[in-house]
Regions:
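Positively charged, solvent-exposed patches that mediate nucleic-acid binding
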Residues: 1-129
Length: 129
């Protein structure tokens, strides 16, 4: 399970991350990354605080992935894949980083190892050099 401090729950932050963040994709997922709470000043005060906390991840799994059971299993695998990448400590997330991971239909058939590799790769490529 993902710790509450790493969960992205605000609709405003979801939208802002998808609209203004960098997007990188793979065969199984698309990752949107908004670094350092960029644009947080335009949010209401309670959300500004959330936008500057350390990496928060939201998940989008559409009906194109499969039925409810398939979507739920896929979201659990992706959430765990993100947690694995986070726990590795190899990626240095700047304060206020928000990520939205969108599952593609192929993610339902992918193994956990594939998902970890794709999530790690997309996050690495999305960060500015």
């Amino acid at each position: 399970m993902l710790a509450p401090k790493h969960r992205l729950r605000s609709t405003s932050l979801f939208g802002k991350t998808i609209r203004n963040g960098r997007k990188k994709g793979s065969r199984t997922v698309v990752v949107h990354v908004l670094v350092g709470g960029e644009g947080a000043e335009a949010l209401p005060a309670p959300l500004q605080e959330a936008a500057t906390a350390g990496p928060r991840m939201g998940l989008v799994v559409s009906k194109a992935v499969g039925n409810a059971v398939t979507r739920h299993n896929t979201s659990r695998k992706i959430r765990h894949a993100f947690r694995t990448v986070l726990d590795e400590g190899k990626l240095d997330f700047p304060a206020g980083t928000t990520l939205v991971i969108r599952a593609l239909p192929k993610s339902a058939e992918a193994s956990f190892e594939e998902l970890v590799g794709d999530v790690r790769s997309c996050i690495r490529r999305a960060f500015p050099r």
